[in-house]
């Protein structure tokens, strides 16, 4: 059996596209990566000089090669990143100090709190994310899935993973991303042999992803509430109920206009954030000079010790509010794909970092002289002539921060769907220029309802800050764990250095987590509830898909049976596209189909959509074509990256497949047959399977399959819906899988 990559240009070199020919037995072996690489390692270790080809060497793509930017281009990207990346992080001064509860605080307390903020902000945002985590990109893409993608490219994940593994023999040399030779390490071998730890890593990724969705519901609520609360200081007749109502109206309008996209107004986001950073920096500097210039002594960490000695348990409890100063730090990594490392680093170092330090220092200086204003720190510390300009800018900045998290939620769901670990929902592209701008009505309405309920439920109290902090710190803990594995396996860092990274940052984040766990009943349960909701959907979907795959593999239609069945049926002109999740073998639903039809099309193509653990796939690598038996039967694997758009029209798709088949045709007669089949029309056959789990399985498994998975399968879109097939050309074949 031969797999052919569809060419659209002159034959590429070995460094561009891998074209490997393997026999059928090799293709069926899901452990082919592991066994082949072990042989290569053994040979290399004995001095044979054999070195495994790396992922980037074997699967190199021009648009994955890092681009060179001039300093002007980097500066422009830095400016643009302010409105996308730093909205959440930049608006933290709205609510950090006001979320702190402390009895009778004095000068030493505010200096200590500021010292904690300064060092936390510096260590987490600057050192961890800007200097370290940003380097762990997947061909320019960042975020939790990018880290997971890197690991999947280097570690052979086996077994029934929540995120499906799709092995082909042609992938043997497509495994690695690093340009360095991958050494056989004990950790690598351990991970490749331990399905339990592979599952742990995968569950961390899924949980972290779901936690970000919780962040997407909490950020708009706390940002808008904190910005609008300032209006209470203008009139005693304005109550908290009025603030909540105004916040709900703003949030409703924000979510309502998501369907129109942000392309028409996104150009204003960066100017708004520039104004915001300028205002908070100068107001902070003003407060330092006017109220308490010595506040800058907080750079000395010994004031942290003094603060904890003075306040003991109360100091530990305030950490749950102080952690809000680093909300949005994860966005620097998650939004990396929209910019580049240099631009994000420049924007943070030149604008964001100094502005935030001045803002927090100014608020602390103000509180030293006005400790009673702790609950209304932000607006109370704003000079009277600047109140209304600041109120307007703060509200706009809160909307920008909210928009960034909402857009990130859509993007995360899109990546989850692409990797097969979330049921397909409607994804609409809201911009013709920027493919990353997508909108999902289902996710949008869920976030809107959750956000409004959170706003009404918490009413702007300190509990909403505690809930927000839980979501923030857990995502950071997940990143710390994944980064440690990346440092050891991919970067091949010294184990002492990787251990230092893990211990240092896990300790900081762990201390914050212990404080937040104390607040679970006071609001910290909200992000866990949202995470649990999405995680149940994810696990139900992936577990059901894995059981479906197991059944199809166990009941695959044998080659001899298929040939006999096809040759005994009459053939009629046209093309029949069988859509299947299987890349190897004939699924059992085909047996069910041919038993109920009198004739078959002269051209039959089994099509599988496959998502590779890379950001995007070039058009010339989109199709892998294979001839099957008998004559007129083919297999086509359509490859996408997890950030690619599956937006191919049904008719265009058939034409592309036929064009690919013609390129591997052996003679002119075969080309004529293909052209004739295309002219005579096409039919898409989709399987509609229902899985029923028997009583021999436990109640929990039966509930996941017979109830949750069946509900998701019934109410969400099918995997082939992205092909936009004409319903008049579609035939659905139903079949019951009893497992």
From Swiss-Prot:
It holds the Pfam family K_trans. It is found in: Membrane. It is a multi-pass membrane protein. Its main location: membrane. One of its GO terms (cellular component) is membrane. One of its GO terms (molecular function) is potassium ion transmembrane transporter activity. GO terms for biological process: potassium ion transport. The chain crosses the membrane at residues 82-102, 113-133, 199-219, 237-257, 269-289, 319-339, 348-368, 386-406, 438-458, 470-490, 495-515, 520-540. High-affinity potassium transporter. NCBIfam families: kup (TIGR00794). Belongs to the HAK/KUP transporter (TC 2.A.72.3) family. This is Potassium transporter 26. It comes from Oryza sativa subsp. japonica. The lineage of its organism: Eukaryota, Viridiplantae, Streptophyta, Embryophyta, Tracheophyta.
